[in-house]
């Protein structure tokens, strides 16, 4: 295991909240879950795990930004997709954390992600220049990832030249390591910690899961 994420041992992180939220019908960053905005909930969960948190927001993203967490916009105009947020995260991390080799990204729409996310992704680095990606139940969660800053220029070129700009396809271009996370035990059965909340219906389901979670479950 190689830990070269930062001088302090903790990596910088960026919450990806710059999407259109078209399926939700309103900005996901400002949507309430359990009386908290999704953005507040994600930041609260992420804060103990990382050295710093910025939020990738664009003009349409909405939501009040918690104090102490800078907003960063895509560096490539035209909303070219989530990889633009990853690139913005890499560029920001290079500026604010000169000793860091990686940046962690977390999407706004999965509020139950593990409290061990950052530590386990960091611990999975072998050579030190891989992308560490979260998995659960046999599925990749490509935006829950630890990205090496050294591949920022390649990502910039990929976004500008590849028509589809698929996150999984970009990951396949580089060395990566998969980190599998178990389901969470709840009173209502197992919960995928990367449960996605993209629609009003999924938000209702997330509220139900929140009510069922055992105090020690996550």
From Swiss-Prot:
Mg(2+) binds at residue 109. It is found in: Cytoplasm. Its main location: cytoplasm. Its EC number is 2.7.7.77. SUPFAM superfamilies: Nucleotide-diphospho-sugar transferases. Its cofactor is Mg(2+). Keywords: Cytoplasm, GTP-binding, Magnesium, Metal-binding, Molybdenum cofactor biosynthesis, Nucleotide-binding, Transferase. One of its GO terms (molecular function) is molybdenum cofactor guanylyltransferase activity. GTP binds at residues 16-18, 28, 56, 74, 109. It catalyses: Mo-molybdopterin + GTP + H(+) = Mo-molybdopterin guanine dinucleotide + diphosphate. GO terms for cellular component: cytoplasm. InterPro entries: MobA-like_NTP_Trfase (IPR025877), Molybde_CF_guanTrfase (IPR013482), Nucleotide-diphossugar_trans (IPR029044). It comes from the Bacteria. NCBIfam families: molyb_mobA. Belongs to the MobA family. The N-terminal domain determines nucleotide recognition and specific binding, while the C-terminal domain determines the specific binding to the target protein. This is Molybdenum cofactor guanylyltransferase.
């Amino acid at each position: 295991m190689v830990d070269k994420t930062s001088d302090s041992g903790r990596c910088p992180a960026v919450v990806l909240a710059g999407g259109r939220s078209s399926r939700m019908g309103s900005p996901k960053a400002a949507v309430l879950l359990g009386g908290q905005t999704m953005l507040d909930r994600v930041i609260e969960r992420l804060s103990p795990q990382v050295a710093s948190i910025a939020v990738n927001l664009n003009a349409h993203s909405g939501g009040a930004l918690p104090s102490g967490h800078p907003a960063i916009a895509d560096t490539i105009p035209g909303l070219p997709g989530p990889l633009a947020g990853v690139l913005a995260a890499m560029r920001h991390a290079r500026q604010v954390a000169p000793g860091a080799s990686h940046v962690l990204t977390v999407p706004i729409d999965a509020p139950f992600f593990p409290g061990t996310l950052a530590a386990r992704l960091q611990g999975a680095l072998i050579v030190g220049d891989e992308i560490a990606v979260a998995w659960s139940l046999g599925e990749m969660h490509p935006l829950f990832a630890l990205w090496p800053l050294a591949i920022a220029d390649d990502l910039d070129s990929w976004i500008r030249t590849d028509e589809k700009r698929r996150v999984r396809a970009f990951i396949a271009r580089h060395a990566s390591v998969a980190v599998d996370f178990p389901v969470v035990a709840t009173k209502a059965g197992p919960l995928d910690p990367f449960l996605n909340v993209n629609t009003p219906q999924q938000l209702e389901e997330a509220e139900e899961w929140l009510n069922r979670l055992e105090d020690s479950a996550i």
